[in-house]
Amino acid sequence: MNYTTQMDAAKKGIVTKEMEIVAKKENMNVKDLMELVSKGKVAIPANKNHKSLDPEGIGQGLRTKINVNLGISKDCYNIDMELEKVQKAIDMKAEAIMDLSCFGKTEEFRKRLIDMSPAIIGTVPIYDAVGFYDKELKDITSEEFLKVAEKHVENGADFLTIHVGMNRKTASTFKKNPRRMNIVSRGGSLLYAWMELNNKENPFYERFDELLDICEKYDVTLSLGDACRPGCIEDSTDASQIEELIALGELTKRAWDRNVQVIIEGPGHMTLDEIETNMKIEKKLCHGAPFYVLGPIVTDIAPGYDHITSAIGGAIAATHGADFLCYVTPAEHLRLPNLDDMKEGIIATKIAAHAADLAKGVKGARDWDNAMAKARRDLDWERMFELSIDEEKARRYREESKAKSKDSCTMCGKMCAVRNMNRVTEGKDLNMLRDDD
């Protein structure tokens, strides 16, 4: 039986090889996974042209996935450096990578990225439009925007971020409800500017059926971008954000009718007390589609530490329904991240994702923690290092401050609770004062 997309196959009762791979990774029955894909509750982004892909599922009941952003810019046009970042993301087992390149001719980098990457690849075609055509933004036609999107999927992008919900109605709501930070989405601001400069409707909204044609042809997932995500805590959960989310819910159903998979993108900056509500609103308005969030960043006062502010928000968001976390690095709001920034951002986001999986009861999530607890009780340092989310750092810290006793560290020495409880329960002397063990 033939099928066009993962969703089309699922609706027809066909188990694809991608479904089989994802089900095995998630320790779940493939028929259960197929049912979730058929209903849009799980997306498996898998472009037919991405030959090196090791597919992952995003959505209900699955492990929380993370995305790494990278790409070339006008001030940092170094393809080799960005390819080093790609390898770093792959080595650290990020499930997805987004190419946010926004200057010049980006196709060479994009092709090399897709060819070398087993991770899911996402792109934002509007970032590429000015460089692709060597034209000012206002002079690009609606048809040309669609052609850029098609070029990206021909190259093998598994999902496209398109800010389709920034239509005239959303723009009108934005104008009537002033914000402290206006629109902080790069793609959203470009589309809003194009609409204002040309007095026209969002080309991706106006020609949404043509966009769906492209996605269906290549089995590309639509990541419906949040142009009105809050850029500061003062702007969170406002009229513009909710108006756009309503539009995204309507667009989701249109995409599903065409068997195109959908991911919904979300905030942004917001205080801790608003996160759970926002997750529930998205799941309600967007019919249970997978939710992809940036952070949320829970305070605006921590430049240089936004990997922490976002990990706090991300853990809460994923606990209450977010399925996909975009990493944030210490360089956020300051500069393009380097390799060290990347590492910190990936680790912080992976911690948030795993913490949420524990809270959600994702199958197998506790196994890792239970193994670490056993290694700690056994004072098996080598095993602890192997299980650490950052093995290199754990080893380095231990090496930098060595205890005299092999079964303790320099925090407690022979007063180590674990050491002493082990000895007492085994009927051994604590041997607190003598240097020998």
From Swiss-Prot:
Cleavable signal peptide: none
Coiled coil among keywords: no
Keyword Flavoprotein: no
A single GO molecular function term of this UniProt record: 4 iron, 4 sulfur cluster binding
Cofactor(s) the record lists: [4Fe-4S] cluster
Ligand binding (substrate): 69, 98, 127, 163, 185-187, 226-229, 265, 292
Residues that hold [4Fe-4S] cluster according to the record: 409, 412, 416
Chain positions recorded as Zn(2+) binding sites: 269, 333
Pathways per UniProt: Cofactor biosynthesis; thiamine diphosphate biosynthesis
A GO cellular component entry from the record: cytosol
Pfam families hit by this protein: ThiC_Rad_SAM
UniProt cofactor note: Binds 1 [4Fe-4S] cluster per subunit. The cluster is coordinated with 3 cysteines and an exchangeable S-adenosyl-L-methionine.
Catalyses which reaction(s): 5-amino-1-(5-phospho-beta-D-ribosyl)imidazole + S-adenosyl-L-methionine = 4-amino-2-methyl-5-(phosphooxymethyl)pyrimidine + CO + 5'-deoxyadenosine + formate + L-methionine + 3 H(+)
The protein's name in its UniProt record: Phosphomethylpyrimidine synthase
Species of provenance: Clostridium botulinum (strain Loch Maree / Type A3)
Gene: thiC
